[in-house]
């Protein structure tokens, strides 16, 4: 049977997992799955449709019918490019609230697993190593102090031309962390066999180099 290598990179908001995953995927020539973007797409689509966050049936229906296309640093929803729209903080907060619902997560599970194709996949999110790809060859869990993550998020937003307040971001991150860790559906936690990587005082390149070193040691087709 053909082995499709998978590297999972999980962690809290603004831990650097998206940037690290992108660079690792480029380095090894694998496909990339930004699972958080899927929840943001559900958040955006449901917000535009005026769906209440408590309406689980409608949220699940939107998730199961998600018409999405990914390109290099770009995302389309029903043919409309929404790369910038899904990165708004309000949409991120809405996505975090939506992600607590198990039916929504179930609706997105098969879509996420469909990204597992040759030559391999790097998947970033919050439950990639624990739920979506429990048999991944390498599981990484990124951590960073909430202060370091708030600074990173602030820079990301400002660089994209989105206004931001670092004190508000700090509060939002703390609230999201609490929600992600305590939710009943796939709470944020490292897989038992995950490699832990604290990026608080690391550059992106240092984090990428560490992940690549770990993968070289376990890659079955090396």
UniProtKB/Swiss-Prot annotation:
InterPro entries given in the database record: Cytidylate_kin, Cytidylate_kinase_dom, P-loop_NTPase
Catalytic function, reaction form: CMP + ATP = CDP + ADP; dCMP + ATP = dCDP + ADP
Localization, UniProt: Cytoplasm
EC number in record: 2.7.4.25
Pfam family, one: Cytidylate_kin
Keyword presence, Cytoplasm: yes
Catalytic EC class: transferase
This protein's UniProt keywords: ATP-binding, Cytoplasm, Kinase, Nucleotide-binding, Transferase
GO biological process: nucleobase-containing small molecule interconversion; pyrimidine nucleotide metabolic process
Recorded GO CC terms: cytosol
Molecular function terms from GO: ATP binding; CMP kinase activity; dCMP kinase activity
Keyword Nucleotide-binding listed: yes
Family, per entry: Belongs to the cytidylate kinase family. Type 1 subfamily.
Identification of the protein by name: Cytidylate kinase
Provenance organism: Cupriavidus taiwanensis (strain DSM 17343 / BCRC 17206 / CCUG 44338 / CIP 107171 / LMG 19424 / R1) (Ralstonia taiwanensis (strain LMG 19424))
Lineage: Bacteria, Pseudomonadati, Pseudomonadota, Betaproteobacteria, Burkholderiales
Gene behind this protein: cmk
């Amino acid at each position: 049977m053909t082995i499709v290598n998978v590297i999972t990179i999980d962690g809290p908001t603004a831990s650097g997992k998206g940037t690290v995953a992108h660079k690792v995927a480029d380095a090894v020539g694998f496909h990339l799955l930004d699972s958080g973007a899927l929840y943001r797409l559900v958040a955006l689509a449901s917000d535009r449709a005026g769906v209440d966050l408590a309406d689980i049936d409608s949220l699940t229906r939107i998730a199961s019918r998600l018409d999405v296309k990914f390109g290099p640093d770009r995302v389309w929803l029903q043919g409309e490019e929404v790369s910038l729209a899904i990165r708004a903080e309000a949409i991120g907060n809405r996505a975090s609230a939506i992600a607590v619902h198990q039916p929504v997560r179930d609706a997105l599970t098969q879509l996420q697993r469909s990204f597992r194709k040759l030559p391999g996949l790097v998947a970033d999110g919050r439950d990639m190593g624990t739920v979506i790809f429990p048999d991944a060859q390498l599981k990484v869990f990124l951590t960073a102090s909430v202060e370091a993550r708030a600074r990173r998020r602030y820079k990301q937003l400002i660089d994209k031309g989105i206004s931001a307040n670092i004190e508000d971001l700090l509060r939002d991150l703390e609230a999201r962390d609490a929600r992600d860790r305590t939710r009943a559906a796939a709470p944020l936690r490292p897989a038992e066999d995950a490699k832990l990587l604290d990026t608080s005082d690391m550059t992106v390149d240092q984090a990428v180099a560490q992940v690549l070193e770990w993968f070289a040691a376990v890659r079955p087709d090396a």
